């Protein structure tokens, strides 16, 4: 149904409208955001006594690592006091803005004074760890199309031969369930809401039909893909480039932290696909750096990681972008965790004469893949360092044999075998080559300071690692990801900025240094391993502060974490070495002025806000 000129004039961004008349109403999206905001305000009013630790506050690092004093009884009381609040927080997402500020909650809690001596190692095991009976995680009333046939092929979905050939070149020969369900409806122009586990091929589910439609009728800017993080934006651009380059498609990646003039020039060149974070794209459009009408012919809008995008913090940018993109367009939402905002959109009765968007969610009893082995390690917070070192230097038996050796060495042997090199190597050299090395590992922390400190700590212990957090410049962040992907270093230490959407092949293990505060954060973190049918291991370190929290995560995700038992005597043999390395890493962080730039920017922001408030008061 065409949008009348009168209604378009009075409400320039009144609706998401697909090519065949399907509508995702923008007003409903905004209502969902406001509902989420009210829930967040209620949470804040209930928990005013909680304090958020700033990422750039290095001086609080010792407190975060559990070095403050207190009684075990006080710790237990604090845990019980916060339990009710945490239960309501389990599925709520914090918005991540354009500058990728991690606003993770890290609650200061009293700690036992004697460390290991004050903690019973059987305390967690004696608790009732059996998950409560839980229905399938599919939200009640969420409409979903029927499961596609197992015989579906890319050709039967309507993709052209050149695109199928491009997929074969990257070893994609058969569509996954989410791809088989969503490619055809998106290809026909329908709006779509798709949900599936991490590593199930959601990106290709919307990328393939977009590329196919552009190849049939290429002109100007056809599609805009919005993501919550910069790293995910670059990854999506790479995937569009791989499948679209043989067809002559062009893309532009528009994110913060990079040269705005260069990005403005890229937009002036009218790429077929724009992959962007909302803040930077809005800045370019508002500043006049891009000529008017550059987005006037956009036909498809995609919100990737839609549960994070449909939060109040992104509402102003999305509202502005809606007004710049034609009202008559196709809209696609994809996510691994279905939030209340998405459920509202899926269940909303469409306007008269309209249909609901096509909705498909991969049904499952759990929110994590079956080939992922999930374990917990229950230890005092003060001795996490030696346990981390031991796990990295002694790969777990659950890790696939193929991932327990250096990927570079394995690939070198494959090349030699392909070339027919059969020369025998000395026995000692062969044993050294086959000896288990540090597996490809992603370590997640709550705070930027913790991530950077662990990175320095591991490097001083001769375990090469790279950091990924918002205190790094964008080129530094891209370099860290590139080195980890190329297997130059075996360990990536990151905050939750690296938990969403990043597809890093051959990650053998994920370690949660800090227990996630929400179950959906847990799902996205552990989803960095066991992708595309591969195996993987996730180890969550649980301290005396997290015993109730892990039970909530088990209930929400519908899994039972298996206890990881290690020889404590062997682990603590490296305690002195690790303690010395931590002191050296702490001094190096202090000398480097870590977080000073962020502290200066924050002070300027506070000063500017006070000045604006004073000016508003005078007016």
UniProtKB/Swiss-Prot annotation:
A motif (Q motif) lies at residues 152-180. A motif (DEAD box) lies at residues 304-307. It holds the Pfam family DEAD. GO terms for cellular component: cytosol; nucleolus. Residues 137-147 have a biased composition (Polar residues). Its EC number is 3.6.4.13. CDD domains: DEADc_DDX49, SF2_C_DEAD. The Q motif is unique to and characteristic of the DEAD box family of RNA helicases and controls ATP binding and hydrolysis. This is ATP-dependent RNA helicase DBP8. It comes from Cryptococcus neoformans var. neoformans serotype D (strain B-3501A).
């Amino acid at each position: 149904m065409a949008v009348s000129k009168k209604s378009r004039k009075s409400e320039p961004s009144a609706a998401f409208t697909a090519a065949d008349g399907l509508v995702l109403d923008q007003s409903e999206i905004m209502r969902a955001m406001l509902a989420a905001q009210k829930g967040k305000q209620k949470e804040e009013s209930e928990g005013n006594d909680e304090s958020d630790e700033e990422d750039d506050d290095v001086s609080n690092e010792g407190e975060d690592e559990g070095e403050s004093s207190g009684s075990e009884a006080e710790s237990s009381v604090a845990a019980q006091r916060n339990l009710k609040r945490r239960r309501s927080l389990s599925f709520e997402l914090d918005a991540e803005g354009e500058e990728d500020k991690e606003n993770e909650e890290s609650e200061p809690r009293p700690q036992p004074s004697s460390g290991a001596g004050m903690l019973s190692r059987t305390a967690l095991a004696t608790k009732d760890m059996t998950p409560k009976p839980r229905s399938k995680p599919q939200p009640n009333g969420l409409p979903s199309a029927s499961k596609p046939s197992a015989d579906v092929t890319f050709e039967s979905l309507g993709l052209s031969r050149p695109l199928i050939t491009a997929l074969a070149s990257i070893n994609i020969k058969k569509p996954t369930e989410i791809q088989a369900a969503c490619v055809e409806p998106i290809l026909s122009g329908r709006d779509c809401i798709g949900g599936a586990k991490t590593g199930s091929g959601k990106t290709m589910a919307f990328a393939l039909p977009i590329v196919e439609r552009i190849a049939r009728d290429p002109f100007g800017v056809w599609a805009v893909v919005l993501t919550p993080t910069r790293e995910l934006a670059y990854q999506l651009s790479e995937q569009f480039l791989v499948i679209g380059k043989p067809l002559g498609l062009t893309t532009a990646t528009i994110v913060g932290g990079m040269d705005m003039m260069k990005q403005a020039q890229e937009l002036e060149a009218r790429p077929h696909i724009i992959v962007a974070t909302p803040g930077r794209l809005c800045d370019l459009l508002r500043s006049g750096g891009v000529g008017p009408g550059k987005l006037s012919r956009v036909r498809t809008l995609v919100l990737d990681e839609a549960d994070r995008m449909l939060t109040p913090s992104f509402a102003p940018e999305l509202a502005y972008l809606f007004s710049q993109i034609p009202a008559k367009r196709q809209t696609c939402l994809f996510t691994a965790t279905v939030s209340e905002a998405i459920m509202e959109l899926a269940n909303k009765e469409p306007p008269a004469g309209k249909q609901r968007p096509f909705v498909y969610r991969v049904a499952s009893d759990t929110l994590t893949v079956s080939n992922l082995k999930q374990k917990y390690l229950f230890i005092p917070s003060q001795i996490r360092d030696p346990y981390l070192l031991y796990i990295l230097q002694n790969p777990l038996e659950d890790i696939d044999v193929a991932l327990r050796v250096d990927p570079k060495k394995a690939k070198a042997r494959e090349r030699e075998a392909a070339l027919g090199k059969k020369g025998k190597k000395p026995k000692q050299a062969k044993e050294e080559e086959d000896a288990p090395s540090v597996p490809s590992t992603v370590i997640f922390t709550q705070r930027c300071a913790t991530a950077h400190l662990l990175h320095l700590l591991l490097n001083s212990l001769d375990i090469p690692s790279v950091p990924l957090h918002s205190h790094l410049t964008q080129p530094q962040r891209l370099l860290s990801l590139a080195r980890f992907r190329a297997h130059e270093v075996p360990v990536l230490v990151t905050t939750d900025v690296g938990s969403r959407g990043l597809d890093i092949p051959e990650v053998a293990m994920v370690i949660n240094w800090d227990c996630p505060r929400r179950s959906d954060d847990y799902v996205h973190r552990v989803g960095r391993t066991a992708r595309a049918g591969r195996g993987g291991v996730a180890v969550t370190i649980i301290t005396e502060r997290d015993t109730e929290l892990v039970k909530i995560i088990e209930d929400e995700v519908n899994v039972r974490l298996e206890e990881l038992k290690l020889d404590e005597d062997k682990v603590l043999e490296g305690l002195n070495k690790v303690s010395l390395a931590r002191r050296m890493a702490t001094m190096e962080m202090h000398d480097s002025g870590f977080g000073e730039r962020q502290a200066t920017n924050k002070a300027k922001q506070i000063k500017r806000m006070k000045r604006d408030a004073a000016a508003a008061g005078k007016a």
